[in-house]
Amino acid sequence: MKTRLFSCLLTLALLLAAAPAVQAANMAYTDVPADHWAYADIANVTEAGLFQGVDATTFGVGQTMTRAQFVTALVRLFDWETVIPEMPTFSDCSDPNRWYYSAVETAYANGALPSYATSFRPLDPITREEMATMMVRALGYTSLAGRMSASQLPFNDVTTNQGYIAVAYDLGLVNGYASGQFKPDQAATREQAAAVLGRLYDKYSASSRQVSRAGYTLLTVPSPEATADTSIPTTPLEPFNDLYDALKAQRTAGTDMSQVAVVFTSGGIATTVQGSRIVSTETISQEEVEEYLDDADTHVFYSEAAQCAYLTSEGTGGRTVTVWYQNQEALEAKLLLCRLFGVNAYILQE
């Protein structure tokens, strides 16, 4: 039992961090000289297969990036399976023969586009605000953006989608200007979009690696204490929002993120409740978690907010046991967040 869960967690990093299957392309654009500020970015996204030139020899430097072009590159980056719905989602993107139709529908199906929108405006230039919003949505961080909507931004011109821009900025995907502005409504050029998506691609496709403690700045994120004033004791391992805040604090403090290792718990925290009283709270091993999971009467759940699995089990004498534990989905989500902050090292401990 222990071997099954332990092996799953140990091999996870090798599986989740694999780069999307993209085909390398030739970097032979006549409009991108080697001394161009975006040369490396354009080479990166071209070789990764995210971008194509406007023709065989021209990248299109200085041309605006359309919303359709950006969402197509985003779909390639995440390597999502193509989605073709029975009925089109957007009134202005309803022709299945359009080159961007499947990419728009695929992005929508994967949460990169808001569910309330009725039109997409595929041929409109994409703005800096829209790029940030689409990337954060694509990462599945809509709830996180909502939490960050009141964050203090270093920009004096952001009035809408503050949370999305805050997350994109915290993750190092977007920057502002020396004037203190973000210029959210400014249309992005193809090379600017290449730089932004290249940053996301590099972080998303990086590898997480399990390390020893020596030589690293260790980052631990404690679980909240169990209380009796909630429907169930809530003690998630490395709660997602707390992990985000801890990583952000390290980066803000100027820490070399490449030398940070996040410590994750491989077992779980079990809290026993009788009536409205907490009887006990203890850390348990992977083997003990597996024993609960093998019990047919155990109920299994997953908290999207905390990015942590939990189970409930009825004990003797009217007692209920709640266990928050590390599973593959939880560790995958947290390792990705770490990589987005530039942290690739982690420690998995009992």
What name fits each language-model region?
Residues 1-2:
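N-terminal secretory signal peptides that target proteins for export/translocation
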Residues 223-227, 326-339:
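Short, acidic/polar
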